[in-house]
Amino acid sequence: MGRLAIIVTFFALLGQSPTTFDLSTDFSLHDNPDKAWQFGYSETNSLASNQFRIDQHVDDLHPIGFWHPAVNNGPGPGYYPYVAFNSTQQTQYGSSNGWAARAGEVAMEASSAGQYSMVRFTAPVAGPYKVSARFAGIHFGLSTTDVHVMHNDSSLFDADIEGYGGDPAFHKVEGANPTAAYSGDINMKAGDTLTFAVGYGKNKTNFGDTTGLFAQVILIKNKQ
C-alpha cells in the first residue's frame, strides 16, 4: 500500500472513531456557546425549542461559577434560572452553603416563574449518538424538581427529583426520588439539539431546588 493510501485510510478510520462530548470536561465559564454546548434557560414555562435563550452574564467565581440570564445583584431579576459549575477536583459548597456540587458537576435551578434552567448540545455532524444524563437533588433542603432530556422538540426522558442524592459526605441521601438517570441511542442530523432541563417541580416553587447534572454525548460514527 502506498504512503498516500495509508494516510487516506488513517484519516477515514479516524473520522469513524467515537467522539466524546463530556459536559464536565467541556464546560466553560468564559465562552457561551462553548463548542457544541450552550448554557441558558427558557423564556417561558415551556420546553419548546424556540423558547431557549442563551445566558448573557457569567460570575466566574471560585470554586463554583455561574451563568445567569443577565447582570444581577444576587437572587432576583436576572439571577434565575442559573447554570453553575464546580471546576475543582472535590465537592464544594454552593451559594449560602445550602447545597454542594461534586467535582465536575453542573448545578441548575429554575426560576420562581417556572422558566427552565437548560444546557443544550448541538450535533456538529449527522450520525448515531449515545446519550447519558444523571440528575440528582443536591440541595440540603431536599430538591423538588422536574428534569428532562429533549431531542429537538421531542421528549426522550422526563422524571421528578424529590430528595438529596449528592455527595453523602455533605448530607445523607434521602427522599422518594433523589436521583434520575437516562441512557439511550439516537440518530441526529447536523444541527439537531439535545436539551437537558431542570424545572421547578410539582410544588411550583424553586426554593431549595438546586439539581446536579452529569451529561455525556458520544458520536459513535460519522456518516460519510
Question: Which residue stretches match the model-derived regions?
Answer:
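Sec-dependent N-terminal signal peptides
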Residues: 4-13
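Gly-Asp-aromatic-enriched flexible segments
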Residues: 17-224
